[in-house]
């Protein structure tokens, strides 16, 4: 764009901005001019004689002039039937001009990010959406979400954010965030002032620059227009971000402000959603050669003001920027919106408009865009058109455009088109549109009808978009159709089930590349070799199936009906991520080091000692623990001292310490159970099976609770022989009492049955009624089993009631039983009884260690001088916005007060008052009324003049 020193003719140009009908308009203004950034097509000129762009005395030698070839000769009016291709010419290269970036940057302050007049300015009003792309690492670069990919976010003009998408960190759809600007130079032209030149070849849709400046509200925009005019600033750099928000790069911005106007542009301006902000960028509209000037169409509308000369020199140049010469030719809608409406594609729109201008159907001066577009019949919607419709609908704020876009979706009856709508974030975008136009019943009915037509297989996308929360209030609407359709839709959604989706495998870019010839062969297969294969309509859909086990499988969204927040992926080797109680991310490594900042280098991994060294260290630690925790046992003379040599361990013994108490108690319960079961087996014929199992579980849990309560457990994975002996004695006493109680209950039951059945044996007695000495036998058996052996252990026998008649157990049998008891293996220290839990714990422990506590809150790092200056400037901008808004509110209140006062005076004049005094008063009243009315009229007229002078469409 022009800046700095200009020729006399060029100083008449100006840049300004159109308010509501344009998608990011921009203009260069002198006095009162309105402009739009939308690259509207440029038809041929009719009915207006075009003055030459240069006066005769302004001609220069070809070697000295930097003007384009057509600047010296007036452009001839193209023929109606002339082809658009015939009007094209070879692009002009400006490689001979020097780079004057340093000089150009002296006319404004260079800033790297937009300054916002308030925290809520520039808000995108869109929820974060996930793309379905997979990570694609080649070397150190993630090639996912590229230009040729089918990335949903890229198609809908949204950038991916690390941690929120499946594509991994550092994908190709982060151009705004990384400031991946094109290589350009600033040149100084003869008539257009400063401009941008491409230093390298650019492809279609390449990102050139973000348009950066101060984001201000409408009152500040109006006041700055007046202020700049008084200061003598001839070139304003305003861009419309939303209906009431503007980007002002007049005094603060970047090199994007130097992009000039052309009637045949090679660039276009578009808005993208980046995180929670709406940002504006300049993109290549076609293939651009190195040395070309970067230009886009301002599409200025001057609202009756004198048009400014256009020096672009293109064959289709209208000769002017602004005025009726340009603005009556077509709508100010951008090409993307025109294509989304299904009127014409971007290439044929210029031709269609040129033909339309010469026919009676040309756009009238009083005709708006809606009336003009209504003359054209939209095309049918196909799968490719869905992408354009959804991208435009996501940022649409004009109701009439939204109605037409929704109408195209509503009339689509192809299942492939509807599936494409769902894939392109259909539920999220329709929810946003519903919230934007929820006051309009017709728009709401359109959206409800589209939602009902969309294919419904699972509830995943419906739940993820949270669209049910937007539809629920409509069930209580006063409009009968809205309420009924909302209830019908919610009822259909309630019948759907949430399908379980296997999460994608996260690729580690630092992992070594493994070759798999089988997978390579599969990837190289040409799928087009089988044209006869029928097309599966469910190929791209996940059809829900039944659960694979009795355990119900549920989606992560089942709980709390919320989408879980995804943790950052692709961290450097050795680093892990988790969240604190407030949901903030922090990072840690295996050594327990924590930090808030995302790590950029692999963690320092302490070398693991060898197995032998580790065993020796463990053995030494066990000796120290045994000496500090237990007193040295005193051995009697007749006892052989036990060896103090520790049993080698594999290093996994102490992993139970990191487990919670509940898991430790479960491990200890499994450790005690073999000893409890050993005693239980001796009573399997003396107690019913179910009672025996129940008693075993109860006594086991009772022992665990008692030992933990009295702090008798040092290691839940093993117990000493002394503990085992006490446990067996306690369990045996418990079961002896249980047997006695069981027999007493049986006897009471037999007595209640009557004398006739008293002699019959009890079926549940297990044969105890066969011997009249059953009770005594049990007592004798108890006495026998409580006799300690030579080692002091309790020897349990299989003596039963009916076994009293059998001979006593021989001494060899007793020795064998003692040997078997001594050979009962204690649970291995490294083995956890549950194989499933052992597998899970080992996997978890080996892959991701338990997260340590979060680091202390980060200290506020001191701001640099530049950061402090930017913060002060942003605070000053906020105060300016607030002051401008306050003044406008006061002015609006004053106008309302004047209008009310004038109406009251006019009413008193009509009523009239008799008498001389009243007569004089009534004569004076009209004067006041007229004066007030003139003031009000003058205010309104002044307001209208301001609206004409400023690029705001009322």
UniProtKB/Swiss-Prot annotation:
Residues 1-90, 507-553, 629-654, 743-954 are annotated as: Disordered. It is found in: Nucleus; Chromosome. Its main location: nucleus. Residues 849-860 have a biased composition (Pro residues). It catalyses: L-lysyl(36)-[histone H3] + 3 S-adenosyl-L-methionine = N(6),N(6),N(6)-trimethyl-L-lysyl(36)-[histone H3] + 3 S-adenosyl-L-homocysteine + 3 H(+). Residues 34-48, 63-77, 635-647, 777-788, 945-954 have a biased composition (Polar residues). One of its GO terms (cellular component) is chromatin. Residues 182-299 form the SET domain. One of its GO terms (molecular function) is histone H3K36 methyltransferase activity. Residues 1-31, 519-532, 865-896 have a biased composition (Basic and acidic residues). The keyword Methyltransferase applies. Residues 750-769 have a biased composition (Low complexity). Residues 306-322 form the Post-SET domain. CDD domains: SET_SETD2 (cd19172), WW (cd00201). Its EC number is 2.1.1.359. Keywords: Chromosome, Coiled coil, Methyltransferase, Nucleus, Repressor, S-adenosyl-L-methionine, Transcription, Transcription regulation, Transferase. Gene3D superfamilies: 2.20.70.10, SET domain, Set2, Rpb1 interacting domain. GO terms for biological process: methylation; regulation of DNA-templated transcription. InterPro entries: AWS_dom, Post-SET_dom, Set2_fungi, SET2_Histone-Lys_MeTrsfase, SET_dom, SET_dom_sf, SETD2/Set2_SET, SRI. Residues 569-601 form the WW domain. Belongs to the class V-like SAM-binding methyltransferase superfamily. Histone-lysine methyltransferase family. SET2 subfamily. Histone methyltransferase that trimethylates histone H3 'Lys-36' forming H3K36me3. Involved in transcription elongation as well as in transcription repression. This is Histone-lysine N-methyltransferase, H3 lysine-36 specific.
């Amino acid at each position: 764009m022009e800046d700095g020193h200009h020729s006399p003719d060029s100083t008449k140009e100006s840049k300004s901005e159109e308010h509501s009908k344009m998608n990011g308009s921009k203009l260069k203004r002198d006095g009162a001019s309105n402009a739009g950034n939308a690259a509207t097509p440029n038809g041929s000129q009719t009915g207006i004689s075009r003055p030459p762009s240069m006066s005769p005395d302004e001609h220069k030698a070809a070697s000295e002039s930097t003007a384009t070839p057509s600047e010296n000769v007036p452009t001839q009016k193209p023929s109606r039937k002339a082809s658009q291709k015939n009007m094209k010419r070879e692009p002009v290269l400006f490689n001979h001009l020097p780079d004057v970036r340093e000089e150009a940057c002296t006319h404004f302050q260079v800033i790297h990010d937009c300054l916002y007049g308030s925290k809520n300015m520039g808000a995108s009003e869109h929820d974060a959406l996930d793309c379905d792309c997979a990570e694609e690492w080649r070397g150190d670069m993630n090639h996912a979400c590229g230009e040729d990919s089918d990335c949903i976010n890229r198609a809908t003009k949204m950038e991916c954010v690390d941690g929120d998408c499946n594509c991994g960190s550092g994908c190709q759809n982060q151009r705004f965030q990384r400031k991946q600007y094109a290589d350009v130079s600033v040149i100084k032209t003869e008539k257009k002032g400063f401009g941008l030149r491409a230093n390298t070849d650019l492809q279609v849709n390449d990102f050139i620059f973000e348009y950066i400046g101060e984001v201000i509200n409408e009152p500040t925009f109006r006041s700055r227009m007046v202020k700049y005019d008084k200061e003598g600033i001839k070139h304003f750099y305003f861009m419309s971000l939303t209906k009431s928000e503007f980007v002002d790069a007049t005094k603060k911005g970047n090199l994007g402000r130097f992009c000039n106007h052309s009637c045949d542009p090679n660039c276009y301006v578009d808005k993208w959603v980046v995180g929670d902000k709406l940002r504006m960028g300049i993109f290549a509209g076609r293939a651009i050669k190195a040395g070309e000037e970067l230009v886009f169409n301002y599409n200025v509308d001057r609202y009756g003001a004198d048009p400014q000369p256009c020096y672009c020199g293109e064959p289709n140049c209208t000769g002017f920027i602004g005025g009726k010469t340009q603005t009556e030719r077509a709508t100010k809608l951008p090409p993307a919106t025109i294509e989304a409406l299904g009127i014409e594609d971007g290439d044929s729109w210029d031709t269609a408009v040129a033909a339309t201008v010469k026919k009676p159907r040309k756009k009238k001066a009083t005709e708006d865009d809606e009336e003009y577009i209504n003359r054209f019949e939209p095309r049918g919607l196909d799968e490719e058109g869905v992408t354009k419709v959804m991208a435009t609908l996501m940022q649409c704020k004009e109701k009439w455009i939204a109605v037409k876009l929704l109408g195209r979706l509503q009339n689509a009856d192809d299942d492939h088109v509807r599936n494409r709508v769902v894939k392109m974030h259909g539920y999220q975008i329709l929810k946003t549109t519903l919230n934007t136009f929820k006051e309009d019943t017709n728009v709401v009915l359109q959206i409800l009808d589209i939602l009902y037509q969309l294919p419904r297989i699972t509830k995943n996308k419906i739940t993820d978009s949270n669209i049910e929360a937007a539809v629920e209030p409509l069930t209580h609407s006063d409009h009968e159709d809205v309420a009924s359709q909302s209830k019908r839709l919610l009822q259909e959604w309630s019948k759907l089930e949430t399908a379980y989706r296997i999460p994608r495998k996260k690729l580690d870019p630092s992992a070594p590349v493994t070759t798999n010839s089988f997978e390579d062969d599969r990837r190289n297969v040409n799928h087009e070799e089988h044209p006869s294969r029928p097309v599966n309509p469910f190929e791209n859909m996940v059809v829900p199936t039944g659960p694979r086990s009795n355990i119900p499988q549920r989606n992560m969204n089942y709980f709390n009906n919320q989408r879980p927040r995804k943790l950052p992926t692709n961290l450097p080797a050795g680093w892990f991520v988790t969240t604190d109680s407030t949901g903030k991310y922090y990072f840690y490594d295996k050594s327990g080091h924590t930090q808030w900042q995302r790590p950029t280098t692999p963690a320092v991994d302490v070398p693991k000692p060898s197995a032998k060294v580790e065993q020796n260290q463990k053995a030494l630690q066990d000796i120290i623990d045994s000496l500090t925790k237990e007193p040295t046992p005193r051995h009697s003379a007749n006892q052989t001292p036990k060896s103090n040599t520790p049993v080698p361990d594999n290093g996994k013994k102490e992993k139970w310490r990191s487990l919670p108490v509940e898991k430790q108690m479960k491990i200890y319960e499994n450790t005690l159970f073999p000893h409890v079961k050993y005693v239980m087996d001796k009573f399997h014929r003396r107690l019913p099976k179910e009672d025996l199992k129940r008693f075993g579980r109860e006594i086991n849990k009772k022992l665990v609770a008692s030992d933990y309560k009295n702090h008798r457990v040092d290691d839940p994975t093993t117990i000493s022989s002394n503990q085992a002996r006490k446990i067996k004695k306690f369990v045996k006493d418990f079961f002896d009492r249980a047997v006695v109680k069981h027999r007493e209950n049986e006897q009471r039951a037999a007595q209640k049955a009557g004398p006739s059945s008293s002699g019959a044996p009890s079926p549940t007695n297990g044969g105890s009624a066969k011997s009249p000495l059953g009770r005594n036998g049990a007592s004798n058996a108890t006495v026998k089993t409580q006799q300690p052996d030579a080692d002091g252990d309790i020897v349990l026998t299989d003596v039963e009631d009916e076994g009293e008649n059998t001979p006593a157990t021989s001494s060899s049998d007793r020795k064998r039983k003692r040997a078997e008891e001594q050979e009962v293996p204690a649970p291995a220290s490294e083995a956890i009884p549950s194989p499933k839990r052992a597998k899970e714990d080992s996997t978890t422990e080996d892959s991701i260690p338990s997260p340590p506590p979060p680091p202390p809150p980060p200290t506020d790092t001191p701001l640099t001088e530049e950061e402090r200056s930017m913060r002060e400037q942003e605070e000053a901008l906020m105060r300016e916005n607030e002051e401008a808004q306050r003044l406008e509110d006061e002015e609006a209140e004053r106008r309302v007060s004047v209008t009310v006062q004038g109406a009251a005076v006019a009413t008193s004049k009509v009523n009239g008052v008799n008498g001389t005094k009243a007569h004089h008063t009534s004569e004076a009243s009209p004067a006041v009324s007229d004066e007030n009315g003139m003031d009000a009229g003058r205010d309104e007229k002044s307001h209208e003049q301001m609206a004409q002078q400023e690029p705001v469409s009322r």
